[in-house]
């Protein structure tokens, strides 16, 4: 095995012309993408539009494809005649300058996220249509989709009416010492070899400030699953999740959608299953290497398989 250090990775990346590589891929897989970038529902007032949505979104796509993390860094790196000409040539338009990052940020802030989702969906459908993802099916059947939530940002004061809220209390007095307002997103990521890409997204957020029960990851999963099912009704899905997902609502959604699931198990999450496994693993457990598994564990009228590694 060749160990890749970060430095050698960076050196190697320098040799790649990401722009050309992206254009090659785009021509082969996503012929229609330029049109789609142009057709997004532009939230801006027509009289203020200096750069088309295609120029802005394409610049951002290139930023990400080139592994540039900040907008200001992008402008610094892209604002060269050659680069501007390349982008203009690809999009078939006249360009003297690239949009300022404030212009890009303002546009992205006002754009409905669904407009970006439509472009992502188009790209994923093209990959399925061209059968480019066939070799990544588990047991030649299911595509693994990992679900997990991640924090987006947090604030010490309320930032909007949809914020989730967490109060930290003093253990002795019970007084609230600190309140944190935060936003989270639940992502469904398709696993393709050693890469993953986002296939569906659901924000975890409250409807308003006065909700009696806050939104949570499992509720967001219910919405995410409905979205995924609507977008790809016949996709053979295998859900991968951490131990939080080992619960009846998730099992129920998966069975009714004909999805398989592979979920990490923690003893505390479903005690009856843990008890049964521990009671019979010495007698009926099958072993291979360091792993022991039991095929038929009954839980809420369903049968689960538990593997201990
Ligand atoms: Zn907020």
Task: Walk through the language-model features, giving the residues of each.
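An anionic, glycine-rich sequence signature occurring as long contiguous blocks
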Residues: 266-309
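Short, conserved catalytic/metal-binding motifs centered on acidic residues
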Residues: 59, 74-75, 100, 104, ...
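Charged, often Cys/His-bearing segments associated with DNA-binding zinc-finger transcription factors
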Residues: 1-34
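Domain-level cores of phosphate- or acyl-group-handling catalytic modules
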Residues: 211-273
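Short, structured patches in soluble enzyme cores that scaffold and shape functional sites
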Residues: 149, 190-192, 203-205, 243, ...
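Gly/serine-rich nucleotide phosphate-binding loop at the start of the catalytic core
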Residues: 23, 27-99, 105
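Electropositive, glycine- and tryptophan-enriched low-complexity nucleic-acid-binding patches
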Residues: 169-235
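Active-site-proximal, Lys/Arg-enriched surface segment
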Residues: 105-195
């Amino acid at each position: 095995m060749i160990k890749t250090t970060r430095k050698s990775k960076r050196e190697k990346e320098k040799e790649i012309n990401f722009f050309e590589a992206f254009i090659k891929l785009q021509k082969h897989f996503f012929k229609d993408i330029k049109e789609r970038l142009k057709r997004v529902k532009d939230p801006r007032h027509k009289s203020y539009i200096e750069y088309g949505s295609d120029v802005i979104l394409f610049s951002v796509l290139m930023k990400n494809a080139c592994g540039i993390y900040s907008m200001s860094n992008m402008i610094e790196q892209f604002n060269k005649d050659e680069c501007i000409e390349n982008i203009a040539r690809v999009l078939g338009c006249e360009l003297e300058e690239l949009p300022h990052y404030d212009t890009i940020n303002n546009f992205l802030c006002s754009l409905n996220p669904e407009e970006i989702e439509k472009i992502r969906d188009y790209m994923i459908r093209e990959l399925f249509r061209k059968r480019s993802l066939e070799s990544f099916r588990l047991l030649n059947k299911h595509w693994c989709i990992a679900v997990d939530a991640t924090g987006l940002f947090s604030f010490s004061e309320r930032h909007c009416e949809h914020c989730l809220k967490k109060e930290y209390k003093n253990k002795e007095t019970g007084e609230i010492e600190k309140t944190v307002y935060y936003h989270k997103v639940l992502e469904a990521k398709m696993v393709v070899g050693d890469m993953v890409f986002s296939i569906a997204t659901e924000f975890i957020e409250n409807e308003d400030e006065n909700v009696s029960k806050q939104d949570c990851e499992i509720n967001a999963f219910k919405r995410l699953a409905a979205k995924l099912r609507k977008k790809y009704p016949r996709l053979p899905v295998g859900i991968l999740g951490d131990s939080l997902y080992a619960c009846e609502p998730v099992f129920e959604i998966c069975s009714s959608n004909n999805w398989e699931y592979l979920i990490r198990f923690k003893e505390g999450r479903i005690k009856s299953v843990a008890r049964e496994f521990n009671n019979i693993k010495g007698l009926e457990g099958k072993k291979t290497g360091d792993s022991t598994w039991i095929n038929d564990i009954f839980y809420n009228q369903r049968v689960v398989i538990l593997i201990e590694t």
